[in-house]
Amino acid sequence: MENRNTFSWVKEQMTRSISVSIMIYVITQTSISNAYPIFAQQGYENPREATGRIVCANCHLASKPVDIEVPQAVLPDTVFEAVLRIPYDMQLKQVLANGKKGGLNVGAVLILPEGFELAPPDRISPELKEKIGNLSFQSYRPDKKNILVIGPVPGKKYSEIVFPILSPDPATKKDAYFLKYPIYVGGNRGRGQIYPDGSKSNNTVYNATSTGIVRKILRKEKGGYEISIVDASDGRQVIDTIPPGPELLVSEGESIKLDQPLTSNPNVGGFGQGDAEIVLQDPLRVQGLLFFFASVILAQVFLVLKKKQFEKVQLYEMNF
């Protein structure tokens, strides 16, 4: 009886341990796969440095273009679209974390003026919801609602990202004014080359850490290589580890120099940033402008009518 209870207890503990392990694995994998925007959020209080450089460029080293389109002017308390385009060749494949090839993902950060923020769901029209798709935006910080991040998301489906933005109303927000404001944006396609801790990803080129001769190249069981480099002058041996992904450019017996590329550069993506301007327009100014135009048109009409009346009087006097 005691042995049976002991067996049941051991079985219960094993089941519980396996369940916990599975949960930890799932949580860890989810965090890793969705961590790309989090890198900047965790490491930087503000994604835009004093120089104007967006911090995403610290990990995505290649430069690629992006395009941002916003209305020239908007009225207070109005929902409008900010459209970000991240162009790239859809046929390209990137190196994934496991060394295999796969489609490119994209991500973006949108830095709006103070007071502008993500539009609430009940203010977004059905047409705009259709343009947005299944994208889920989040604030860079709980207290920075004007800075939005998105990604990573599939590039083939979302190379054009539509942000639904709500403009502020100076009548209810004291820090909002009827002015021209700058908008900054950064967008990447593909994985980065550097992790926040400074280590390299497998989506970049690997260089030799020593001058010498390649004595041996060991192909690792899970992919990647270990390259033994021997210095001919003192016999010192250095081992460079290459993760799965980059293609090897050197062979055994080859003489190499310090910082010489050992692999190709597999990166096909890159990061770009841009800016635009938007005017928060005062409705009273718009009404005043419309009134002015109406007055000018009305004055022109009266002038034409007066001229025709004067011509008729002249013609009558000449006939008389």
Curated annotation (Swiss-Prot):
Q: Which InterPro entries does the record match to this protein?
A: Cyt-f_TM (IPR024058), Cyt_f (IPR002325), Cyt_f_lg_dom (IPR024094), Cyt_f_lg_dom_sf (IPR036826), Rudment_hybrid_motif (IPR011054)
Compartment(s) where it occurs, according to its Swiss-Prot or TrEMBL record: Plastid, Chloroplast thylakoid membrane
List UniProt keywords, sorted A-Z.
Answer: Chloroplast, Electron transport, Heme, Iron, Membrane, Metal-binding, Photosynthesis, Plastid, Signal, Thylakoid, Transmembrane, Transmembrane helix, Transport
Q: Does the keyword Cell cycle apply?
A: no
Q: Where is the signal peptide?
A: 1-35
State the superkingdom: Eukaryota
A Pfam family the protein falls into: Apocytochr_F_C
The GO biological-process annotations, alphabetized, read as:
photosynthesis
Q: Name one GO cellular component term.
A: chloroplast thylakoid membrane
A Gene Ontology molecular-function term?
Answer: heme binding
Q: How is the cofactor bound?
A: Binds 1 heme group covalently.
Annotated positions binding heme: Y36, C56, C59, H60
Cofactor(s) it depends on: heme
Membrane-spanning residues:
286-306
Q: How does it sit in the membrane?
A: Single-pass membrane protein
Does Transmembrane helix show up as a keyword for this record?
yes
What is said about its interaction partners and assembly? The 4 large subunits of the cytochrome b6-f complex are cytochrome b6, subunit IV (17 kDa polypeptide, petD), cytochrome f and the Rieske protein, while the 4 small subunits are PetG, PetL, PetM and PetN. The complex functions as a dimer.
Q: What task does this protein carry out?
A: Component of the cytochrome b6-f complex, which mediates electron transfer between photosystem II (PSII) and photosystem I (PSI), cyclic electron flow around PSI, and state transitions.
Q: Which HAMAP family match?
A: Cytb6_f_cytF (MF_00610)
Family statement drawn from the similarity comment of this UniProt entry:
Belongs to the cytochrome f family.
Name the record gives this protein: Cytochrome f
Q: What does UniProt list as this organism's lineage?
A: Eukaryota, Viridiplantae, Streptophyta, Embryophyta, Tracheophyta
